[in-house]
């Protein structure tokens, strides 16, 4: 079962179950799936035709340049649905670098197994493209979700752009399980705490730097939290 087929299954079985909450906006599994099907190509994104560099069934890369978390997610899923190889650009990437990224991809091509692309964080320089097959994620989701105790009843709070691999993997993994993702564009830890309490969040996924901010600003016990998952960086003794 593909990621899109899994979402269709939830739309058919539990269309009114909440899939995503962004601040006060709630999106059900039915609404999310319908948004994927009804979406049309957005000219803020860019299609790179791989031509003779890729003789596989997928030969077009979709560079997604949306800033909104919802738009990033829906366009990424739409790209999978339409047979593109979607890749979400980091919000801070400038036009010059996106142009260079597009040039490199068009010249070097992508592996024939690729279903989507991800970008490195760019901490050692400019972000670099990496390529993944859908099966490399979805075949591990059940194991991953079991390790992190993620299931259909999970309410997970996370913060960051969908362009970051850890965030996108966690979001799709939670949706695969039928759970609910809660996020915000706000950089204020007090806002994060408010959402965690309002929606009875039981999981948090965040970089240790953001966990430190959360700990620093949280003056009371968050009783609903059962699991905290740190992403990409080493947790220090203080945390």
Give the location of each predicted region.
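Conserved AMP-binding/adenylate-forming core of the ANL superfamily
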Residues: 3, 8, 16-54, 95-98, ...
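Conserved pre-ATP/AMP-binding loop-to-beta segment of ANL
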Residues: 15-16, 105-119, 139, 149-156, ...
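Conserved AMP-binding/adenylate-forming
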Residues: 25, 41-92, 158-162
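ATP-dependent adenylate-forming carboxylate-activation enzymes
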Residues: 66-67, 85-101, 179-199, 208-210
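Conserved AMP-binding A3 loop
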Residues: 115-142
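Conserved AMP-binding/adenylation subdomain of ANL enzymes
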Residues: 138-155, 163-203
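Adenylate-forming
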Residues: 187, 201-239
